[in-house]
Amino acid sequence: NQRTDEYGGSFENRARWPLSVLKAMRERVGDGLCIDMRISGDELVPGGMGIEETKAFIRLAQEYIDTVHVSQGLIVEPRYMPYTMPAFYLPHCHNVKWSEQVKADPDIHIPVTVVGSITTVAEAEEIIASGKADMVAMARQLMCDNKLLYNAYRGMEEKTRPCLRCHECAPADIVHLRCATNPRLGRESEIPEELPCAKHKKRVVVVGGGVAGCMAAKTLVERGHDVTLIEKGDKLGGRLHEISCLSFKFDMRQHLRWLM
């Protein structure tokens, strides 16, 4: 913001425009609608907002909003987007350090939501139980497997397909929504949520125990076929073993375990 009028320069001036927008929204919808504001704990851009200015702005904005949703990075700067939508080389729950600081501010009185690479119910429960946030937001993991909460409730967490955080779904605003591991995403009208049992049970041989072979075998079994999976090597999973060997590729190792 390089403006020199009443909307630029000092913190108060720079806050004027977004506060006027939030005020107008609240006046328009009244108290019957919850307004959630997403904001970065740290924009990471030189000269951008850091956590102290973020907290200062939330203190002003809380008059007009019901909850604040803490992220990181700046979406208008592509090089900082991997922090806004954390890729697989960043740690899980990496925005919690910002939501924790917002929660600890004695002058912020509204509920705090945190988002960013929170992919399991266990991670979400730990964040909330430790007081680092009041709520947790998930997006990619639920696109990868919308039965996350159902499986957790039933004690079947191991059945949940883990998100790779690979960003296959990221260009959804310009192309059809897709997922690297969930073939149904974006094709819900074509592929039923529960695959029907085959009309005629068959004995099927799948040759090759790589990722595609394992997935084909799992799907065939779900449809009721008698499946034999043949792999020339000594382990299933194919190239995923080599790809996931680096320490930061935790999500791919999780996917490998899920496949098995």
Please annotate each region the language model reported.
Residues 1-207, 211, 216-222, 227, ...:
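Flavin-dependent oxidoreductase catalytic cores
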Residues 240-260:
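N-terminal Rossmann-like dinucleotide/flavin-binding domain of flavoprotein oxidoreductases
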